Amino acid sequence: MFFLCLVCLSVSHKMIGICYLLVAILCGFIGYIYSLFIRLELSLIGCGVLFGDYQFYNVLITSHGLIMVFAFIMPITMGGFTNYFAPVMVGFPDMVFPRINNMSFWMFIGGFGCLVSGFLTEEGMGVGWTLYPTLICIDFHSSLACDFIIFSVHFLGISSILNSINVVGTIFCCRRKYFSFLIWTLFIWGALLTSILLIITLPVLAGGVTLLLCDRNFNTSFYDVVGGGDLVLFQHLFWFFGHPEVYIIILPVFGLVSTIIEVTSFRCVFSSVAMIYSMLLISVLGMFVWAHHMFVVGMDVDSRAYFGSITVLIGLPTCIKLFNWIYSFLFTDMCICFEIYFIYMFILMFLAGGLTGLFLSNVGIDILMHDTYFVVAHFHYVLSLGAVVGVFGGFFHFLMKWIPIELHTFWLFFFISTLWFGSNMVFFPLHSLGMFAFPRRISDYPISFLFWSAFTLYGMLLLTFLVIFCCCLFNVILFWDYCLFFINLFTYSLSIFFYFYTWVPVCMAIYLLVIDFAHIILDYLLIILCFCFVFYIFFWQAFLLFFYI
């Protein structure tokens, strides 16, 4: 009860940041399970593991996208790391609005609850994470699940806006007099620009989905062509938020990467002022390129040329950041530590995603590649491999500040090598599949795509093995934590017994010790069952693939 009150009512920015991290990791685990079922379904042609239920396949696609974007990566970067470190880096004891900070966390919990409710209600919400009106309108999806999704977007958006207002207020109101903006850390600049982007773009998304809710329930026709509405209007409203969302996710990761380089090299990143201006330019230009997601809706030639040119122009400040990081690696005496390898991996993956983005900025190529797996590979290399790897680097870098342990070097290198090979096995073949017009959001395909589509499953199983390994590592950490806690509790109980001559404290300590050790044993049995499930799927898939070939 004391622990629940401590978490529910806490206004400490560090406690709220840790709660954001833990809940976001849980959400990411759920989203990963959805993606595992997606890859299992795509590893076979015809009737796969979902038994031909195409609606449920689209529900998995929708849930995976919304959870990973709104409930995993955004809360980790803005809710977790920014809440924990922003007040410390500006020299303030807490956020400027601590109770609003607590309220934004519980709004995030409510939004995730609505999201899961939409997945479990009736036939689910197979509309795609973009929520286009042609799919989510009442004629095609009369389920209450779609309304839950719209409410979840509202809850998560309000949570992000409150958190962003808090971050901006903390950074500006706590700034000392005669304190130059240019000597802020790059992480603070990333958090500040991300918060400003959220405050500007999220109300536009909220207005768009509110009109969608009215069309579904109040007989309006904002997006109904028969009633005089415009379908493309929602795409403009959504992508005005949707493309800056990429920079909302990646800018705090830029700050984390720069912070790790500064700490390990004992000096600032090369040309910090240029890094600041490049982030400013990325944020400004990112507001004016939303329609490059809409090249196939019938735009005129001038609009296509404008949005394509601005998209290419964003590559300039991005290259400035990449070359400054590379220069900092090559020409500074860095302390070689484990998180540096995460930074290497982040730079390579983000560079690969950026290069494929340059291909898609060409209007003709984008029209050819639209709604294929080439686009899926592009944004997964930027987000799933870029942002998540940067978050891993920041997490391991600051791990010693949260947990007073040191992880073994061999297992750390095992972790990053498995992550490297598994993630590239999953996403790199999607480029070739997309160039041969493998369509998105469709669970069946010709047999000519079977080999590479099944090959990605092996990478997914490798990542599943890595997730189970992380669960084992977490249980080992908790195991030692349990041991130390209950040994101290047992010693304290014995001292009370010898002082008061009563067996009650000793019996309570033994009872708690037995219960928690049984809990640990059950955890390990669950992990063993997960291992068995992964290897069963692996051999089953290999047998069926051999049968098909």
UniProtKB/Swiss-Prot annotation:
Principal place of residence: mitochondrion
GO cellular component: mitochondrial inner membrane
Reaction catalysed by this enzyme: 4 Fe(II)-[cytochrome c] + O2 + 8 H(+)(in) = 4 Fe(III)-[cytochrome c] + 2 H2O + 4 H(+)(out)
Record: residues binding Fe(II)-heme a: 64, 380
Positions annotated to bind heme a3: 378
Pathway(s): Energy metabolism; oxidative phosphorylation
Sites where the protein binds O2: 247
GO molecular function annotations of the record: cytochrome-c oxidase activity; heme binding; metal ion binding
DNA-binding recorded as keyword: no
Residues engaged in binding Cu cation: 243, 292-293
Highest taxon of source: Eukaryota
Compartment list: Mitochondrion inner membrane
Cofactors: heme; Cu cation
Membrane association type: Multi-pass membrane protein
GO biological process annotation, one example: electron transport coupled proton transport
EC number(s) per entry: 7.1.1.9
Keywords of this entry: Calcium, Copper, Electron transport, Heme, Iron, Magnesium, Membrane, Metal-binding, Mitochondrion, Mitochondrion inner membrane, Respiratory chain, Translocase, Transmembrane, Transmembrane helix, Transport
Crosslink position(s): 1'-histidyl-3'-tyrosine (His-Tyr): 243-247
Cofactor note: Binds 2 heme A groups non-covalently per subunit. Binds a copper B center.
UniProt KW Translocase keyword: yes
A Pfam match: COX1
Record family assignment: Belongs to the heme-copper respiratory oxidase family.
Role played: Component of the cytochrome c oxidase, the last enzyme in the mitochondrial electron transport chain which drives oxidative phosphorylation. The respiratory chain contains 3 multisubunit complexes succinate dehydrogenase (complex II, CII), ubiquinol-cytochrome c oxidoreductase (cytochrome b-c1 complex, complex III, CIII) and cytochrome c oxidase (complex IV, CIV), that cooperate to transfer electrons derived from NADH and succinate to molecular oxygen, creating an electrochemical gradient over the inner membrane that drives transmembrane transport and the ATP synthase.
Subunit structure of this chain's protein: Component of the cytochrome c oxidase (complex IV, CIV), a multisubunit enzyme composed of a catalytic core of 3 subunits and several supernumerary subunits. The complex exists as a monomer or a dimer and forms supercomplexes (SCs) in the inner mitochondrial membrane with ubiquinol-cytochrome c oxidoreductase (cytochrome b-c1 complex, complex III, CIII).
PANTHER family: CYTOCHROME C OXIDASE SUBUNIT 1
The protein, known as: Cytochrome c oxidase subunit 1
